[in-house]
């Protein structure tokens, strides 16, 4: 959402930007929207909680990962399977959508003693054979998305997964080097690919969650986020 509002984690010189108006607009809009129309307990809901709400017909709109499409369209698990539509994340009029790029990837540690076995597993788990195996057991709509380009040309998958083309379009449209409206020094759409982000991202997320829960104001949350980001960037040597 912040990208579509033109917000940045840092400017070109790694100066934190939570004190800028774009972040105020983003967080205020989010908090107001969720308080007015979001589910109860939204500040503590994660993927599984929101998935359950959507499948039960208690959440009218859910913006999340493309992998969730197969879950919400499965009539065995979802009460709204025949009522679900799919759309790209919104554009706030500045030329950037609020979508992101994320993947659960398979990697082989350089120091492993069983690299050959690991490589065989990775090759198998991303192979056409595995895709066909999952399809035979769980149905074409439930095969792992985003692992093989050929999947999106498969007529059986296209028929079973009405979200297939939109998923591929979303993947192709993601641009980790230009995530928001203004230039940034980092790579990453919904995260910043630097070591400091793991801790900083958690801190900022908790601050924003507290604002949604009514434990702090939007202004206070942004000030604390700015302070935390400034401290992290100073300690990391990005700024003085």
Q: Residues of each region from the PLM?
A:
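Short, well-structured alpha-helical segments that form the helix of a local strand-helix-strand
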Residues: 54, 218-231
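Solvent-exposed, amphipathic alpha-helical segments
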Residues: 199-214
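Short amphipathic alpha-helical coupling segments at ligand-binding clamshell hinges
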Residues: 22-29, 113-125, 220-224
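Short hydrophobic/charged patches on amphipathic alpha-helices used for structural packing
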Residues: 48-51, 55
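Glycine-centered hinge/linker elements that transmit conformational signals in sensory
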Residues: 13-44, 85, 89-90
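C-terminal lobe and pocket-closing loops
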Residues: 67-81, 92-202, 240
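Extracytoplasmic/periplasmic solute-binding protein
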Residues: 1-16, 22-23, 59
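Alpha-to-beta junction loops
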Residues: 56-65
């Amino acid at each position: 959402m912040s990208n579509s509002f033109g917000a940045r984690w840092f400017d070109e010189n790694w100066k934190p930007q939570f004190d800028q108006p774009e972040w105020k607009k983003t967080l205020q809009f989010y908090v107001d929207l969720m308080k007015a129309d979001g589910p109860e307990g939204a500040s503590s809901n994660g993927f599984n909680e929101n998935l359950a709400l959507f499948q039960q017909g208690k959440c009218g709109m859910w913006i999340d990962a493309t992998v969730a499409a197969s879950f919400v369209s499965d009539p065995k698990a979802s009460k709204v399977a025949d009522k679900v539509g799919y759309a790209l994340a919104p554009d706030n009029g500045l030329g950037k959508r609020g979508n992101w790029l994320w993947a659960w990837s398979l990697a082989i540690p350089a120091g492993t003693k069983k690299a050959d076995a690991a490589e065989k597993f990775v090759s198998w788990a991303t192979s056409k054979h595995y895709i066909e195996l999952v399809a035979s057991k769980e149905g074409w709509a439930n095969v792992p998305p985003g692992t093989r380009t050929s999947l999106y040309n498969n007529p059986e998958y296209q028929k079973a997964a009405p979200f297939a083309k939109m998923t591929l379009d979303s993947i192709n449209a993601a641009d980790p080097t230009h995530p928001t409206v203004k230039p940034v020094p980092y790579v990453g759409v919904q995260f910043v690919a630097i070591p400091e982000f793991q801790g900083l991202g958690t801190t900022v997320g908790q601050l924003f969650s507290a604002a949604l829960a009514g434990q702090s104001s939007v202004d206070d949350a942004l000030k604390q986020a700015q302070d935390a980001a400034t401290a992290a960037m100073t300690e990391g040597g990005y700024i003085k």
